[in-house]
Amino acid sequence: MQDRFIKCIAQLPKPLSDALIPLLNADFAGHIDAQQLGMLTTKSQLEESELLLALLPIAAALAKPPISEFYVGAIAKGKSGDIYMGANLELSGEALFHSVHAEQSAISHAWLSGETQILDVVVNFSPCGHCRQFMNEMVEGQKVVIHLPEQKAQPLAHYLPYAFGPSNLNITEPLLSKQQHELSLDSSDPMIIEALDHASLSYAPYSNSYAAVVLETKDGATYCGRYAENAAFNPSMLPMQMALSTMTRHNREFTEINRAVLIESAQGKISLVGATMDALHAVAAVELEHIVIDPA
């Protein structure tokens, strides 16, 4: 079991902790598939909603909040039945806008894993306005059920009434809808190919700045992030922050970053290169490889 879970596993009911410990191996990064979730439900003798709330200390253990020292964990349940954990991330000494919220982390985890709809979001503290707006961008966002400790489960519409969202800007394929933007680049570099694939799956209906980041560690592992825009603009999630959140979930240190690539479309109304370099240089002494490509 990873060291970061030792303290929180003691907070769980023993039947649950006994069933969960084998899953918390060196490769665990917050994903529990539907079959494993069913096993945990059976062995813990908890209802699924109770189980998800009980798992929040595990999700919160994925957090890296050096500024606030406030650990927030979130769990997103996808239409597939799988669950995806996420947690807040802050960049030490840097402006707060670089932060990733737990709900963003969990939802981006699900999105990177191929989920096309989130049914439930479970979180240990009430979602802030930023996160409510971020969740509202998703497919059927107003119907996502929010679960909080000692609170009745309620749809997002309860927490964000009279919402402004993608439909107000005539967007018919919101976040988590299948995206496939035609981007092409002649390269045999596996890392650039991976970044290109993720850029083609990014969500940027407002700026058309389709983009992705891939980070490579010294052992050759790669961690990616895609751009996820928001109708309210500010709650958009940048690909570098998503990639750093992915690294954190996998228990990797930013000092292990050996290479960083940003790919973005030349046809976008904005460029993410400045914000991407700021975040990268805050955590690693690596130069950003910036590639601008034309649509196919």
Curated annotation (Swiss-Prot):
InterPro entries the record matches: APOBEC/CMP_deaminase_Zn-bd (IPR016192), CMP_dCMP_dom (IPR002125), Cyd/dCyd_deaminase_Zn-bd (IPR013171), Cyt/Deoxycyt_deaminase (IPR050202), Cytidine_deaminase-like (IPR016193), Cytidine_deaminase_bacteria (IPR020797)
Catalytic activity: cytidine + H2O + H(+) = uridine + NH4(+); 2'-deoxycytidine + H2O + H(+) = 2'-deoxyuridine + NH4(+)
One Pfam family named in its UniProt record: dCMP_cyt_deam_2
GO CC annotations, alphabetized: cytosol
Enzyme Commission number: 3.5.4.5
Lineage: Bacteria, Pseudomonadati, Pseudomonadota, Gammaproteobacteria, Alteromonadales
GO BP annotation list: cytidine deamination
NCBIfam families xref list: PRK09027.1
Species of origin: Shewanella woodyi (strain ATCC 51908 / MS32)
Known cofactor(s): Zn(2+)
UniProt similarity note: Belongs to the cytidine and deoxycytidylate deaminase family.
Protein name: Cytidine deaminase
Functional description taken from the UniProt entry: This enzyme scavenges exogenous and endogenous cytidine and 2'-deoxycytidine for UMP synthesis.
Entries under HAMAP family matching the protein: Cyt_deam (MF_01558)
PANTHER family assigned: CYTIDINE DEAMINASE
Class in the EC hierarchy, top level: hydrolase
Positions that bind Zn(2+): 101, 128, 131
Keywords of this entry: Hydrolase, Metal-binding, Zinc
